[in-house]
Amino acid sequence: MGSLGSDNIAELEANGSAFNLNPLDPEEFRRQGHMVIDFLADYYQNVHKYPVRSQVEPGYLKKILPESAPNQPESLETILDDITNHIVPGITHWMSPNYFAYFPASGSTAGFLGEMLSTGFNAVCFNWMSSPAATELETIVTDWLGKLLALPEKFLFSGGGGGVLQGTTCEAILCTMTAARDKVLNKIGKDQIGKLVVYGSDQTHCALQKAAQIAGIHPANFRAVRTFKSDAFGLNPEELRKVVSADVEAGLVPLYLCPTVGTTSSTAVDQLRGLCSVAEEHEMWVHVDAAYAGSACICPEFRHFIDGVEGATSFSFNAHKWFFTNLDCCCLWVREPQALINALSTNPEYLRNKATESQKVVDYKDWQIALSRRFRAMKLWMVMRSYGVANLRNFLRSHVKMAKLFEGLVSADERFEIVVPRNFAMVCFRFNPTKKDRATGPELDRINEFNRRLLEEVNSTGRLYMTHAVIGGEYVMRFATGATLTEEKHVRCAWRAIQEHAAALMEKIYYKQRN
C-alpha cells in the first residue's frame, strides 16, 4: 500500500482537504459528529419548507456528480455542501410534517440516538458470543413490548416462545413461512412441496406472495381470498373456509395463513378469531401481520383489534412505522422458536463455542435469513425508556385525533366521501359529488380518473404528499397521519390545498366541456 509524501500532505492541507491517517480518530469523530448533528437538527427545523415529494427527474444525480470516486480526500464541509445542494432535492421527505403518504416513518430523537449508538459500537451480533449485551437486550425488549401488547404468555421467552427483531415484515413472513414449510414437509415428505398452499386476502401485502415465491411454493398455490365492502374489506372466515375446503378436496395441503391487522390499502382488520379457528382445523401456521397497526394496540382502546391472536403461531409489527423507532425494526414473536431454528440454523465449525453448546443462550442467527445482524435492540430500548409507555400511548392517540379531524373535514364537504371506516390514523376518501354508493362502468371510470388527476395535481405542488389505493374497484386517496412533526395546523392546511385543487380541476374540466 502506497503512502503520501510530505509534499502531497502539504498540498492537501493547503487546499483545505480533511486528511487523517486514522479513519476513526476520536477527536475528528467528535468534530465531524457535531457537524452532522447540527446539519440534521437544521434539516428537521426546516423540513416543512421543502417540497414533500421530490421534484427531480430520473437520472438527475448522474448529471451532477463526477463519473468516478475522488483520488484524494475531501472535507466534510464540502461533502455536506453537496448533500445540501444535490442530495436533499432528490429526497422525498418522510420526516416532513406534510407527509401523509403510504404509512409514516415516525423517527424520534431517542430512535436516532439509539441507532447512532448501535452504529458506533458496530457490533456484528449473529450469536450470543459475538455480543452478549445485544442478544440479551433483544430478548428483554421483545418481552417488554410483548407485554405492552398483552400478547399471550406463550409468545414470550418467559412462556416458551420468544421475540426477534427483523429488518422488515417481508423478512418476518419469509422466516415463518420457511419454518412452516419445513415442519410440514418433514411429516409428508419433501417431494410434496408442490401441494403446499399459502392463503391471504386480496388486501394482503405483496410481501406474502414474494415470500411464497422465495420459499418454493408453486405460484398456482397462492390464494388471495376475495374480500367485500360488507366486511369493510377484512377477510371473512367463511370465505376462507370455502377456499380451503376446495383445496383439500383437490388433494392440496393448506400450509400458511396470513391475516392482517391494518391492511396497507385501507387499514382493514381481518377477523382473527374466526380465521384462526379455520386454520386450526387444518393445522396451518397462522402469521398475524400487524405491520402498521400493531403499534396502536399498546393502547387499551385499540387492543381489541388483535383479539384472537392467541390462536396464531406468530405475530409481527414494524416499530419503524408508528412506534418512533428509526428504520429498520420489525418485531416478530413466535410460539415455537424451535421451528424457526430447525429451518434456519447453520453451525459451521468456526462459529462453535461453549455458550451455544450450553443451550443456555439465544443465537439469533438461527432466527433469521442472514448470518450477520445489527444491534437493533438498542434503539427500541431507548425509545421505550426515553418516552415511557404513557407518552408513547399519547403520541399515538394524538395521531388518531388528527386523523379524526381530517375525517370530519372531509365529511363536512358534500363533494367528498369517506370510502371505508377509519380504524386507526389513516383516512380513505375520494371526490364524488354524486355520492352514488356503487357507481359502475363509465361513471365509475370518470370518478376514478378525476381522483387520480386530483391526487397527482396535489402531489406535484410539493405542499403535501398522499398516495392512493384501489378498493373494490374505487380509486381512493389515502391520508395517513403519523409523521412525528405533524400538528393539527398541517392537517388543516393539507385539507385546504385538496379543496382548492379539487375546485380548480372541476373548473378546468367544465371549461373544457363548454369549449
UniProtKB/Swiss-Prot annotation:
Alphabetized GO MF terms: pyridoxal phosphate binding; tyrosine decarboxylase activity
Top-level taxon of the source organism: Eukaryota
Pathway: Alkaloid biosynthesis
Bridged cysteine pairs (disulfide): none
Cofactor: pyridoxal 5'-phosphate
Amino-acid positions noted as binding substrate in the UniProt annotation, renumbered to this chain: A105, H205
GO process terms (BP): alkaloid metabolic process; amino acid metabolic process; carboxylic acid metabolic process
One Pfam family matching this protein: Pyridoxal_deC
Chain residues that bind pyridoxal 5'-phosphate: T169, C170, T264, N318
PTM sites of type N6-(pyridoxal phosphate)lysine: K321
GO cellular component, one term: cytoplasm
EC annotation from Swiss-Prot or TrEMBL: 4.1.1.25
Protein keywords: Alkaloid metabolism, Decarboxylase, Lyase, Pyridoxal phosphate, Repeat
The reaction(s) this protein catalyses: L-tyrosine + H(+) = tyramine + CO2
Homology family: Belongs to the group II decarboxylase family.
Protein's name in the database: Tyrosine decarboxylase 1
UniProt source species: Narcissus pseudonarcissus
Gene designation per UniProt: TYDC1
